[in-house]
């Protein structure tokens, strides 16, 4: 039989197949090979009834996230708050390049719009992201149609209202929500386990909130690919390996001068590129010491 793991708990994997859910375990040979089934995996399994079965094989994965481990994701809703905590375009772009690199379609959702005196600044930022090609939504009514026929994860900085949003989407989840800490200005982590839930014509999963992200982009070429607007322009650069920093006849810098490119995103690209180069230098020093 073939199915999808929709929940992992205490060594059991709950596999959905043809409308039924089977409780399974992974055979010992997975552990010997260093393989672990994850929520989202397509698996072959055997089961005589719903109470007990065994996973026999794991199909190849199209993508994965590691905190917590979840695989084969169609899209990710990145939740950013308009206020408390303040909207942070740098953090948003870190989420976006991670998702682009993982081939996961991003959707940007802005929470707490009601706390703003005027929504115009956020809406203006939204128009910039929409011009790049991203879905940028500020209401539940805009978000819900995007969930149909997709496996969707939700991510965002702690305290942005992720559990609150999920409870509005699927009240049966009854997820615990955390208040913002006055001393730190951050929310408490309130989500723990990961499961898929059927709702609004698709499947949704919860992931813990993050205040920072580590991305595994290792070079300028991969970083360029993670910025759609740079990716579209870079083939016009004189040099194929152009980093869009100092090279002559750079199409990205030309677009920046004409106003075609949003300066905020270019600044973030330069910052992330610098971080990648610094990590590479640190790694070289460590290797030399060995």
Swiss-Prot record:
Q: Name one GO biological process term.
A: ribosomal small subunit biogenesis
Q: What does the record say about how the cofactor binds?
A: Binds 1 zinc ion per subunit.
Cofactor(s) demanded: Zn(2+)
Q: Enumerate the InterPro entries for this protein.
A: G_CP_dom, NA-bd_OB-fold, P-loop_NTPase, Ribosome_biogen_GTPase_RsgA, RsgA_GTPase_dom, RsgA_N
Keyword terms? Cytoplasm, GTP-binding, Hydrolase, Metal-binding, Nucleotide-binding, Ribosome biogenesis, RNA-binding, rRNA-binding, Zinc
Summarize where GTP binds, as residue positions: 111-114, 156-164
Q: Source organism's superkingdom? A: Bacteria
Task: Enumerate the residues binding Zn(2+).
Answer: 237, 242, 244, 250
Any idea which GO molecular function terms this record carries? GTP binding; GTPase activity; metal ion binding; rRNA binding
The UniProt record lists the EC number as 3.6.1.-
Subcellular location field: Cytoplasm
Gene3D superfamilies, from UniProt? Nucleic acid-binding proteins, P-loop containing nucleotide triphosphate hydrolases, Probable gtpase engc, domain 3
Single GO cellular component term? cytoplasm
The primary location reported for this protein is cytoplasm
Tell me where in this chain the CP-type G domain is found. Answer: 62-213
Family to which the UniProt record says this protein belongs: Belongs to the TRAFAC class YlqF/YawG GTPase family. RsgA subfamily.
- Enumerate the NCBIfam families for this protein: ribosome small subunit-dependent GTPase A
Question: What this chain does, per the record?
Answer: One of several proteins that assist in the late maturation steps of the functional core of the 30S ribosomal subunit. Helps release RbfA from mature subunits. May play a role in the assembly of ribosomal proteins into the subunit. Circularly permuted GTPase that catalyzes slow GTP hydrolysis, GTPase activity is stimulated by the 30S ribosomal subunit.
Q: Can you state the subunit structure given in the record?
A: Monomer. Associates with 30S ribosomal subunit, binds 16S rRNA.
Q: Which HAMAP family match?
A: GTPase_RsgA (MF_01820)
Indicate what this protein is called per its UniProt record. Answer: Small ribosomal subunit biogenesis GTPase RsgA
Record organism: Streptococcus pyogenes serotype M6 (strain ATCC BAA-946 / MGAS10394)
Q: Which gene encodes it?
A: rsgA
């Amino acid at each position: 039989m073939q199915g999808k793991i929709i929940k992992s708990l205490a060594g059991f994997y709950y596999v959905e197949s043809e409308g039924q859910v089977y409780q399974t375990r992974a055979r010992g040979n997975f552990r010997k090979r260093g393989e672990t089934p994850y929520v989202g995996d397509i698996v072959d399994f055997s089961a005589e009834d719903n109470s007990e079965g065994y996973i026999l094989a794991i199909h190849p994965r199209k993508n994965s996230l590691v905190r917590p481990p979840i695989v084969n994701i169609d899209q990710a809703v990145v939740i950013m708050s308009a206020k408390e905590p303040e909207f942070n375009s740098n953090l948003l772009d870190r989420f976006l390049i991670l998702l682009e690199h993982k081939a996961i379609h991003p959707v940007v959702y802005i929470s707490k719009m009601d706390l703003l005196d005027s929504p115009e600044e956020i809406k203006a930022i939204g128009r910039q992201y929409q011009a790049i090609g991203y879905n940028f939504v500020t209401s539940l009514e805009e978000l819900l149609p995007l969930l149909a026929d997709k496996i969707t994860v939700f991510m965002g900085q702690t305290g942005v209202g992720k559990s609150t949003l999920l409870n509005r989407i699927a009240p049966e989840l009854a997820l615990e929500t955390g208040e913002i800490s006055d001393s730190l200005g951050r929310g408490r982590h309130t989500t723990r386990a990961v499961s898929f839930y059927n709702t609004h014509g698709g499947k949704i999963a919860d992931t813990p909130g993050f205040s920072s992200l580590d991305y595994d982009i290792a070079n300028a070429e991969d970083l360029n690919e993670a910025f759609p607007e740079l990716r579209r322009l870079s083939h016009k650069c004189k040099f194929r390996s152009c980093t869009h920093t100092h090279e002559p006849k750079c199409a990205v810098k030309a677009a920046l001068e004409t106003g075609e490119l949003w300066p905020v995103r270019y600044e973030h690209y330069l910052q992330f590129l610098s971080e990648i180069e610094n990590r590479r230098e640190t790694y070289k020093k460590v290797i030399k010491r060995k």
